[in-house]
């Protein structure tokens, strides 16, 4: 085997077997590490919650995201519902998004896919189908799948959750929209990265994937070092934000999220780990800061992108 072909072979082995290649491999060589490093391997996405308080229609939010310089957008299903109720066409919205040079990287919806009650779960899966269809109409490929409806339950059987997630994945595969298993740090179920990874891997589904969030990993007490054990292929989108030193983890809320770099989150090590593990997806800015909601939405979007890129450059440069 020539040096070139050997390097190519080693570079093709970033993960070991798992659901969707969730676990990182252990192959480390000087030849691989000596290859040129891309200091900007990630894309940048805008979660519309960041300017949610300004109550802009989704068509305006799309314009703002594009003007601010993002590559992708992550709308909420309730915004799509509002657009449709006002007489807007979802397909036309999708065309507007594409014409603005944006991709729909994910969408935020809520449906009870994980609950024990069979009738409630059946309704939740129907709502999931409705959400996925709307996302598909605007050109989207993924939707968040948080543990909605189970946040106060600490006794759910994770093995059953793997089966339920696989059912949801099968539905998504038939429609063309992948449900991303989301970590919710405040939840008693799937509130930690380790639990979410167990369910995703245990599903055995080729499209299984995880949607992490800097704030939620902190809120749920997930060690950030745990990201080192997961391949970048496990993630398509990673929610980025920061948080202050106070209040503490037990009392901190979504509203305390701040721009990347303005808090104490270990963003340097997070971004370094993501690059090393092969993540090449979207970093999506997701904030719920009430002070930002009082400001000009375009300025907030621009500031968020600038600070996100600065944080990445600082960590990787």
Q: What feature does the model see in each segment?
A:
Residues 58, 83-86, 90, 121, ...:
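Flexible, glycine- and charge-enriched loops at secondary-structure boundaries
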Residues 50-52, 77-79, 110-111, 147-151, ...:
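Active-site-proximal loop/turn and secondary-structure-junction residues that shape catalytic pockets
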Residues 2-68, 190-212, 216-317:
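Histidine-acidic metal/acid-base catalytic patches
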Residues 74-94, 148, 152:
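Glycine-rich, proline-tolerant flexible connector loops at the mouths of alpha/beta enzymes
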Residues 13-23, 33-38, 60-66, 96-103, ...:
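Active-site acidic/histidine proton-transfer and metal-coordination neighborhood
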Residues 89-99, 164, 168, 226, ...:
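Catalytic-core regions built around general acid/base machinery
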Residues 79-81, 112-117, 151-155, 220, ...:
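A short acidic, helix-capping loop that chelates divalent metal ions and anchors anionic groups
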